[in-house]
């Protein structure tokens, strides 16, 4: 053997040492060791046999590769899940899969390999190591691997440590199977009101935004603040009311989840009229998303129906500016609820735009027109409705455009006078009137699919 060289151990054939920089400067999330207690830098592993065994969860092979005297405090290079734009030459950009740093512990936690995780921890893997910005506990929570979460917490993993995006493990309990992970985190000391570093979101904000009813219930029972504010001034109730319908088929289920969340939050003491920095309130957001049942719930709590946001929009404006997917959620019910609670009517000059926008929802047009004593449309308004829509709703649009040239019926005019007289107390006074149910429904703008 040449002088000055030593024989390499089996590990050193495959492991290259990283630069001898303190761990905190290399990885960012590790705390600096105190002076006089240096910590060795993790070893960079390029052994494909080891990596394959980790990704497949081959416990027997890993027991061979990690004998009792070895260490599992290693760093692996893995390819990013998504390509990123990068420039290696001036002016030339390409999509490349960047290399990301991880550890055997992260791989086992992200794939739910519980026994592998136990083996690595016995081989001195550090539970809070985060070379890529996340700890193994973050990865286990993302995957909903409850057993792995428990093993890591018992091993001393920090339940409140932030990742590279400033999110704590509890913020990442979002998908299926993560409710049990959240319960474990809370049992081991996770802060129920811990905020993410940039957005200042609490776990309750995340649960409300994603429509996770069971998780929101758990967090509230463990003391989560129902009126916590994020960096934009949003409360969990605002986040819940902004739940979007992804498709017409999902409309009913989305509104049901949103309603359940709002009931939970209001029962826990959430402010039903809390506004964000742009003065948007839960009612504005529920109307924009077309959640009729949520709108009625908020109105029953006494929220201000005519409050304006920073742009001067009321809840009725928001309802009429909603996305096309709101058609599947019966926007006419939102508009009717607002008008029956004293919402200021649409400016007559804007009615042609409303007709053009909502012509495929004739009941929305009907309930709006029934709040005026006369028809407020120009004769050329018929051209705003596509011929196909006119044909599909021939009876309604025939009655609508006939009234452009003639007065409304005496019955309708009487309704307008009574509603105007009771304007300030309309929702409370109408049900108390000694009138037949059918007439009460008429006064409350019941749908008839025709105008007269």
Describe each PLM feature range.
Residues 2-31, 37-42, 68, 80, ...:
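Cullin-RING E3 adaptor/co-adaptor recruitment helices
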Residues 80-100, 243-260, 322-330:
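Intrinsically disordered, low-complexity Ser/Thr- and acidic-rich flexible linkers and loops
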